[in-house]
Each structure stands twice: as C-alpha cells, then as structure tokens.
C-alpha cells in the first residue's frame, strides 16, 4: 500500500518491512532511523519536521499519490488539505476518548487509571477525536512512572498500527465507531506551577503526581528554600504525628518523611533544580535535616 507517513521513523521502517511503499515521509526526529528511512523513500520525499501547513509540503504529499496517510507520534495537527488527499489513521497511547491530547501518560497515572492502552483511530480536523478503529487495553502497574508506561505501550502501539494498515491494504478496513463525547477527557501539557506538589493532598495522590511527572519534567517542592524535583516517593503511616502537612522530619532509619493531608510520604529519589544533580534518599534526608536546623 502507498503510504504518506508522519511521525517517528521506526513505524515507517516497520511498515516498509511489511511490504508497504512509503511514498512520502515526514519525520519528527533525526538520527539513524531517519537516515534509514530516507534510503527507502524516493529522493526529495523525506523531510525532517516540515511545516505541514506549507503549500509546498501539501503539494509534495499530493504528488506522491498515497492511498493512506499514517500518523504515529507526529506532534502537530495535520491540516485538512492533507487529510483530504487520502484516508488518514493514527494511534494514540490511551483508550480514547479518555485522555485526548499531548500528555496521556501523565494523566493516566495521575488519575489513578487501572487500565490504559492504545487506540487506532481515523484522523480528522481535531486532535484525537476521530472514529475508533481498534483498541488494545493494558493493565497499568501502579509502580510505573511515565517513562515506564510509555515503553510498555510502544510495542502494542506498533503492533496495532501494522495490523490496521494491513487490513486497509487487504481491502478490509476495520469498521469505525464514533467516540463517545460524554466519556471524553483531556490530557493537556502542564505548566510549571501545575507540577508543584500540594501537601494538602493524600499521600497516594502525591505519589501518583510524582510518578506521572517522572522522570521529566518532574513534580517539585521546596525544601529549606531549595527547589527539589521528586522522582520517587512512597506513602507511609510511619511518621511523627506532631507534623503538620508540608512539614518534614527524618526518621530513625534515616529516611525523610513529609506529612501530607492524609498520611505521609517517604522521600526516596529526586533531582536538584540548581544543577540537575541526582539526589539519593540520603541526600534528601540531609536537606530535610539542614532545613530543620535553619
């Protein structure tokens, strides 16, 4: 099948391996994958991060005569003139219509979802709103951070993409189901203020926020006047009861704990905002001790 591809080169290379012809490719990342992809596509039809609203780009896609447009981790919306050239499909790393938007990993963890997954859907004029072609659920391990979740969804996402493209090539495109707008939720990117830890939350809520933002950009707090990004915390009931929310202490076992709205959390790993240096459990305990003495 003749495919115009937008996104990370790995998926395009796998589709080419499956026997499809990549007649136009717009990659969002350079590197070895991009160089390999360029060797598979006709000269002049592989580009790196093009402006997809540019009339020249639209004309190049049209001239390639694709039968299908594929988006896999392309980070901008494809304009209607491109989507009018051929049917378009994409794969989103959530169970749409839940967590539409650029940061579904964060929101799946932060919301405490027990199950997430990937969704193949038609491309339309809005982000992640097209009719659903297929889904693959995945249990969400509560210990995963955003990086672990992203890695866990990579293979199911690629497998689902290849399966759906093969169905199109065989003339058996999956039936589509419109998304239920009543069940839709947004997954926007968060600003720096949104990533500040609220110690009025429960310990479990704080742990989810830390995991959802790790390893980058990370949820942050202030310890003794110093901004610290927390990468791993653990809820605990072993803390001095005299502490108020946001107050910290170091237990006899050497682990720093901070009182939350309900329970407390142990500070296990972090990163200094000053120089991005990693902070161990011991480093965090030393910061808490220093802040209590000051």
Predicted regions and their residues:
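Short, solvent-exposed secondary-structure boundary/capping segments
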Residues: 238-245
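One-carbon transfer enzymes
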Residues: 1-217, 221, 226, 235, ...
């Amino acid at each position: 099948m003749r495919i115009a591809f937008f996104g990370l080169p790995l998926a395009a290379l796998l589709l080419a391996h499956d026997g499809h012809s990549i007649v136009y490719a717009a990659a969002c990342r350079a590197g070895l994958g991009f160089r390999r992809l360029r060797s598979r596509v006709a000269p002049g039809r592989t580009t790196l991060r093009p402006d997809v609203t540019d009339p020249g780009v639209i004309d190049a896609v049209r001239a390639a005569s694709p039968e299908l447009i594929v988006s896999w981790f392309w980070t901008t919306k494809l304009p209607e003139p491109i989507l009018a050239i051929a049917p378009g499909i994409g794969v989103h790393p959530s169970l749409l219509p839940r967590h539409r938007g650029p940061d579904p990993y964060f929101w799946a963890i932060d919301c405490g979802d027990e199950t997430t997954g990937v969704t193949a859907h038609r491309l339309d004029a809005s982000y992640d709103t097209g009719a659903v072609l297929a889904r693959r659920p995945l249990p969400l391990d509560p210990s995963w951070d955003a990086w672990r979740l992203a890695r866990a969804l990579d293979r199911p996402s690629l497998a689902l993409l290849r399966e759906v493209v093969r169905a199109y090539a065989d003339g058996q495109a999956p039936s589509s189901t419109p998304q239920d707008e009543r069940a839709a939720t947004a997954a926007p990117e968060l600003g720096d203020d949104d990533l500040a830890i609220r110690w009025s939350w429960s310990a479990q809520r704080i742990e989810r926020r830390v995991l959802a933002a790790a390893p980058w950009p990370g949820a942050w707090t202030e310890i003794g006047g110093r901004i610290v990004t927390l990468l791993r915390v653990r809820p605990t009931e072993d803390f001095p009861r005299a502490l108020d929310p946001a107050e910290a202490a170091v237990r006899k076992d050497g682990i720093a704990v901070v009182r939350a709205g309900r329970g407390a959390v142990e500070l296990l790993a972090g990163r200094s905002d000053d120089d991005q240096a990693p902070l161990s459990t011991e480093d965090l305990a030393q910061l808490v001790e220093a802040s209590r003495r000051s």
